[in-house]
A protein has these predicted regions:
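Short beta-strand elements in bilobed, periplasmic/extracellular small-molecule ligand-binding domains
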Residues: 29-44, 129, 147-169
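Flexible loop/turn connectors
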Residues: 33, 100-101, 176-187, 191-278
Length: 371
C-alpha cells in the first residue's frame, strides 16, 4: 500500500503564487515517488482537533502550508500526537526549537544584505518596504529582517514601512503620496511591484533611474513583464518538493523528531527597461483588485508552464483576430474559443478589451520564449 502524506493548507491563499507553488511541488514529487499526496483545507481553529486516524502508519508526516500568525500559532497543537511529524513548508519558526516541528524555508538574509549593499554602493540611500500584511508571519519576519539590514547600513527610518493595514489599494495610495522621498522600494511580492511601477511612471518618476523596484520572488513572471524587476529568486516549487522528501525521510527514521532545512535565495537582475505611462488615463490611476488578480493568474500560467495559454494571451494583446491566433497556434476555432473562455475566467475579464486592459500594459511580446 502506498504511503499517504497529508498536505494541510490554510484557507484564503488560493491566488498566492508562493502557496500554489509549494503545493504544486509537493504533489509533483509525490507522483514521481509513487506516494499519495492528499491536500485538504483546515482553518486555524480546526487545527487542534485534527486527526489522521485513517493513515495506517506508525510515523505520520504531515506537510503544513500557511502564513497567518493565528494559523501558525495553532500548528504546535499537532505536537500532542507523538506519532505525527509536522513539516512547515515555506516558513521558519523560532518555537521549532521547543516543539518537534520541521521547517523547510528560504534563507533570505544573505541575499537581502548583499543586494542592499550593492544598491548602497551605487548611491541609493532612501529605502522603503511596501505591502506587508500585518497578520502574516512571513511578512512580519521579512519586515524585521529588512529593518535589521537597514540598521546595519545606518538607513533605518520608522516611516519607511507601508503595511496593508487597510488593504493593498490604500497601502499603495499612501506610498504613492510619499514616493518622491525614496530611491529604492522593496515590495513584498513582484505582483505588487508590477501594479505600482507603471503608475509611478505616470507620475513622472523614471524607473529605474529615480526609483529602483525590488520584488520578493516570482522569478518567471518578473522576467516576462515590464519592468523586468530585480527580484529574489525564491523557488516555491522546490520548497514543496523538499518538504515531500523530508516527509519521506522522517517516515523512514522514527527516532528523528524534526529537522530544519534552509534553501538558498538568489538575486535575479532584470534589465534596465524604461517604461512609460502609455495607456493610463485619470480614472485608471486608481488601484484595481481585479488587476492584481489577473497578474496572479498569469503567474500561475508561468508556474504551470502553460505555454499555449500564454501564447493565446499574447495574441490577444497583439490585436490578432481569433482566426489569426488559431492559425498561428494550429488550433481549431472551437478549441481556441474554449481556451479563451478559460483565460477570461481566470483573469476575471468580461471581454477581450477588458482582458487587454488588465494585462496589456505589463506583458512583453517575448513571453512565449520563456516557457
Amino acid at each position: 500500500m502506498s504511503l499517504t502524506i497529508p498536505v494541510i493548507r490554510e484557507p484564503g491563499f488560493d491566488h498566492a503564487p508562493w502557496f500554489n507553488g509549494i503545493i504544486h511541488g509537493a504533489s509533483a514529487e509525490a507522483r514521481r515517488r509513487g506516494v499519495v499526496c492528499r491536500v485538504r483545507e483546515c482553518a486555524a481553529d480546526e487545527l487542534p482537533g485534527l486527526r489522521f486516524d485513517d493513515i495506517e502508519s506508525h510515523i505520520r508526516p504531515v506537510i503544513l502550508v500557511g502564513s497567518s500568525v493565528e494559523w501558525l500559532s495553532n500548528v504546535k497543537s499537532l505536537c500532542a500526537d507523538v506519532s505525527l511529524r509536522p513539516i512547515l513548508a515555506g516558513n521558519c519558526m523560532d518555537e521549532g526549537l521547543f516543539f518537534p516541528i520541521s521547517t523547510v524555508s528560504v534563507n533570505r538574509s544573505h541575499a537581502i544584505m548583499r543586494l542592499t549593499g550593492e544598491l548602497y554602493d551605487s548611491g541609493r540611500r532612501n529605502f522603503a518596504l511596501v505591502g506587508s500584511l500585518p497578520d502574516s508571519f512571513t511578512d512580519i519576519h521579512r519586515r524585521e529582517l529588512f529593518a535589521s539590514v537597514l540598521k546595519s547600513f545606518g538607513l533605518y527610518r520608522e516611516d519607511a514601512f507601508y503595511d496593508q493595514t487597510d488593504g493593498l489599494a490604500e497601502c499603495l495610495t499612501r506610498f504613492g503620496k510619499d514616493v518622491e522621498k525614496y530611491d529604492t522600494v522593496f515590495f513584498t511580492n513582484d505582483i505588487i511591484a508590477l501594479c505600482f511601477a507603471p503608475r509611478a511612471a505616470a507620475m513622472g518618476i523614471a524607473i529605474p533611474r529615480d526609483l529602483v523596484p525590488v520584488g520578493f520572488g516570482n522569478l518567471p513572471l518578473s522576467a516576462a513583464m515590464l519592468p523586468q524587476l530585480i527580484s529574489f529568486s525564491l523557488d516555491f516549487v522546490q520548497i514543496g518538493r523538499t518538504s515531500l522528501k523530508t516527509a519521506l525521510e522522517l517516515s523512514r527514521h522514527p527516532e528523528q523528531l524534526s529537522c530544519k532545512i534552509e534553501l538558498a535565495c538568489g538575486i535575479c537582475r532584470g534589465s534596465d527597461v524604461c517604461i512609460s505611462a502609455a495607456g493610463f488615463d485619470a480614472e485608471e490611476m486608481a488601484y484595481d483588485d481585479r488587476e492584481y488578480g489577473a497578474l496572479c493568474y498569469i503567474d500561475r500560467l508561468f508556474s504551470a508552464g502553460d505555454r499555449l495559454s500564454l501564447d493565446i494571451l499574447r495574441g490577444l494583446n497583439e490585436e490578432l483576430t481569433y482566426s489569426e491566433i488559431a492559425e498561428r497556434l494550429f488550433l481549431s476555432d472551437s478549441a481556441l474559443r474554449y481556451r479563451i473562455r478559460n483565460i477570461f475566467s481566470g483573469l476575471g475579464a468580461v471581454s477581450r478589451a477588458d482582458a487587454r486592459r488588465l494585462t496589456g500594459r505589463y506583458l512583453t511580446l517575448g513571453i512565449h520564449n520563456l516557457c
